[in-house]
Amino acid sequence: MLSTAAEEDPEGGSRETNNGGETTPDMQWRSWIIPIVVIANVVVFVVVMYYNDCPHKSHRCLAKFLGRFSFESFKSNPLLGPSSSTLEKMGALAWGKIVHKRQVWRLLTCMWLHAGVIHLLANMCCVAYIGVRLEQQFGFVRVGTIYLVSGFCGSILSCLFLEDAISVGASSALFGLLGAMLSELLINWTTYDNKGVAIVMLLVIVGVNLGLGTLPPVDNFAHIGGFFGGFLLGFLLLIHPQFEWEENQVSLMPGTIVKPKYNTCQLVLCIVASIVFVAGFTSGLVILFRGDSLNRYCKWCHKLSYSSKSQWT
């Protein structure tokens, strides 16, 4: 869960001004994919609670006045939600079912499930706060792609380390958005002022939440996988043209030296990020479907995440 992102604007550095002293305006997109994501997560949670039907399976339900939507006991689920068995049936991340039964769809469905009301509210508030801003700046195609693909990356890494636990939650995709914000700052470094403050603030937010990921029962591997997936995708999808190039498109005077759309550093970062992403994504899938575990090669990595039967991201 991401609990601190809504307190600050981590990318608060403003765009540098042009020669006229005015900030170069970015196209403002209407945000609609992130609101749909939030609504979809809420609807899925309601469906899961309906299917869970606690009163017909247990006498220790909370908020019994809700009928079949009542919650499992605090002992069973302290986050006010369904049972682990219900989440597993509805598509939670489960290594055995993905590897042995080839239920690959779980790598995507798990990010739409939540362990409880508290889990859902924490994730969706942060997704809305971060995602709407990114979508307004870069559009629904790029932000939606980062959200889904980085969530998928988080699921892969989680499976490679957690073989005996189920995992649910949208935090892997949420960390993907944070990773994309960081790479966007780096690849468009020359277009921001106050960049030092912005990048330090963002790194502090990510660091604090990764630290919280070592507490039970959070799946920190999903956070890490989502963050690095979004970080690499941000270099590819959130690149801005140089301001000099944009200004030349507005008023190209005779004799003006035309600058390239992207500088050399931006192009190098794009190439390196694409190679690393393809290599990491492909190798992760290959290792997963071979039934292998990265714990065999990294003896200390288990310390990065709390390990239990159920994991919430």
Swiss-Prot record:
Enzyme type, top EC level: hydrolase
Disulfide bonds: none
Record-listed E.C. numbers: 3.4.21.105
Highest taxon in the source lineage: Eukaryota
Sequence ranges of Acidic residues compositional bias: 1-11
Annotated Gene Ontology cellular component terms: membrane
Active-site positions on this chain: 171, 223
A GO BP annotation: proteolysis
TM spans (from-to): 31-51, 112-132, 143-163, 166-186, 196-216, 221-241, 269-289
Signal peptide bounds: none
Reactions accelerated catalytically: Cleaves type-1 transmembrane domains using a catalytic dyad composed of serine and histidine that are contributed by different transmembrane domains
GO MF terms held by the record: serine-type endopeptidase activity
Stretches the record annotates as Disordered: 1-24
Family membership: Belongs to the peptidase S54 family.
Function noted in UniProt: Probable rhomboid-type serine protease that catalyzes intramembrane proteolysis. May function in embryo development.
Protein name: RHOMBOID-like protein 7
Source organism of this protein record: Arabidopsis thaliana
Name of the encoding gene: RBL7
